[in-house]
Amino acid sequence: IGEPINERGPIKTKQFAPIHAEAPDFLNMSVDQEILVTGIKVVDLLAPYAKGGKIGLFGGAVVGKTVLIMELINNVAKAHGGYSVFAGVGERTREGNDLYHEMIESGVINLKDATSKVALVYGQMNEPPGARARVALTGLTVAEYFRDQEGQDVLLFIDNIFRFTQAGSEVSALLGRIPSAVGYQPTLATDMGTMQERITTTKKGSITSVQAIYVPADDLTDPAPATTFAHLDATTVLSRAIAELGIYPAVDPLDSTSRIMDPNIVGNEHYDVARGVQKILQDYKSLQDIIAILGMDELSEEDKLTVSRARKIQRFLSQPFQVAEVFTGHMGKLVPLKETIKGFQQMLAGDYDHLPEQAYYI
């Protein structure tokens, strides 16, 4: 635990900090609300992230959580220019290795001098549960140093917060504690709350955290993801059904939520367009049973138009990622928020109804 793994010698430091610490006082916290633009259309439009907020990426196995996190590091961390901390908690060693080498290739990590602005902390799948339980707290402590000592706006990426809970469950079993629901540790809510309360914005700086959350068997009522829900400002839910349609990122536009989706924060235009998009998608969802039984021909002309627009909107929410260029062969795109709002506004107005569905993939 605490050893460098990149074969570049010992870490030279004079300052040490305990990984268990108290959350900041209420008086030191900042309450300003500001949107963090990611360049990912479906996120910025329908469930925007708050600067200094806690964001959860929910999804089952192989729906694209880690790829989305890597794209956020690529888009936000580079544009934002501040410090980033990545805590790899109980995930695949290969993914951690890939991320490290990609950061070197893209210049986020500079091996020649001290200009790098990212810290990587790993406790991968093969590590004992004690190491996996501590690595999330270690990453958080590093982020707190950048916020409190250097006054930075820090981005903290945790992949995967479920493994933090899982490691706590294993440690609890080794200690002989009586398990709670579904075999989790009896201190599940306390463990999660103690960590999450430290991730906040103070008057010195901010920590914006993006946490990938594995959902066991795609069950959002499982105690581990359900306990995490209470602490989040925004949730991005990745859907297997959308991934099966070949739409990536496979973000569910109806299940994903954000606390700052408020006209007083994002503005009336953004709010109205987002709610208009969600209304069409919800109407389409409610018509799907009728379509399955009776077919499209039995729908009214108005419903046919709703279905047509909804299918086009679904495809327009897709986007090629820069970090996935090697797999898809398509160049990644970063879309400004103004362009996103304008594009969907024109779609809702029917300006592009004459175009076929295929035209809506970027």
From Swiss-Prot:
Coiled coil: none annotated. ADP binds at residues 62-67. Mg(2+) 2 binds at residue 91. Mg(2+) 1 binds at residue 66. It is an enzyme of class 7 (translocase). The modification N6-succinyllysine is found at residues 14, 112, 117. The keyword Membrane applies. It comes from the Eukaryota. Phosphate binds at residues 62-66. CDD domains: ATP-synt_F1_beta_C (cd18110), F1-ATPase_beta_CD (cd01133). It catalyses: ATP + H2O + 4 H(+)(in) = ADP + phosphate + 5 H(+)(out). Its EC number is 7.1.2.2. One of its GO terms (biological process) is proton motive force-driven mitochondrial ATP synthesis. The modification Phosphothreonine is found at residue 165. Belongs to the ATPase alpha/beta chains family. Homotrimer. Component of the ATP synthase complex composed at least of ATP5F1A/subunit alpha, ATP5F1B/subunit beta, ATP5MC1/subunit c (homooctomer), MT-ATP6/subunit a, MT-ATP8/subunit 8, ATP5ME/subunit e, ATP5MF/subunit f, ATP5MG/subunit g, ATP5MK/subunit k, ATP5MJ/subunit j, ATP5F1C/subunit gamma, ATP5F1D/subunit delta, ATP5F1E/subunit epsilon, ATP5PF/subunit F6, ATP5PB/subunit b, ATP5PD/subunit d, ATP5PO/subunit OSCP. This is ATP synthase F(1) complex catalytic subunit beta, mitochondrial. It comes from Mesocricetus auratus (Golden hamster). The gene is ATP5F1B.
